[in-house]
């Protein structure tokens, strides 16, 4: 089952309490997803937003260990990449805190060249960049992007008729 809480101003403590209740009701959780880390609230007395985001990031890391399940946190990127010729995201582009990079076991970025260059020869393709992997290699994976389904699929193998729709 999927359980969604769309409270836009939640804290790590609220997520923790709700996840613990859910775990006690249904058993082990497969995955906790935080859509847009920067929308979360931290403690009121944090010195600045960077410290607040650092505390949120650390709290999510602790939550993953406590629940014994992965926590995926989606993060906004800074606008720094807009000023570079290569728009592929880098770890330093994670917005408002280096702690996100530090706390994460895995950091992945999505990149589509056609977003920045409508005439790109890579139209219909996306790159998943594994920029950090605490216990494995980093790499890039190219996928086909099907915008009418908002879906990513494996690229076609040579000699096939197109992207796999599995």
Regions found by a protein language model. Name each.
Residues 3, 9-29, 58-68, 79-166:
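C-terminal regions of RecA-like/P-loop NTPase motor modules
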Residues 8-9, 49:
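Short beta->alpha junction loops/turns
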Residues 21, 29-74:
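Helical hairpin unit composed of two closely spaced alpha helices linked by a short loop
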């Amino acid at each position: 089952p999927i359980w969604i809480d769309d409270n836009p101003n939640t804290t790590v403590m609220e997520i923790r309490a709700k996840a613990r209740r859910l775990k006690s009701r249904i058993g082990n959780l497969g995955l906790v997803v935080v859509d847009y880390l920067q929308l979360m609230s931290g403690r009121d007395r944090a010195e600045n937003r960077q410290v607040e985001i650092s505390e949120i990031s650390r709290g999510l890391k602790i939550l993953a260990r406590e629940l014994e399940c992965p926590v995926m946190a989606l993060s906004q990127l800074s606008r720094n990449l807009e000023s570079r010729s290569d728009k592929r995201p880098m770890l330093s582009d994670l917005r408002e805190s280096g702690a996100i990079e530090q706390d994460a076991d895995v950091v992945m970025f999505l990149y589509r060249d056609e977003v920045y260059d409508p005439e790109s020869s890579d139209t219909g393709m996306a790159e998943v960049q594994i920029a950090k992997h605490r216990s494995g290699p980093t790499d890039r994976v190219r996928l086909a992007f099907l915008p009418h389904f908002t879906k990513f699929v494996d690229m076609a193998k040579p000699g096939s008729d197109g992207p796999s729709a599995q």
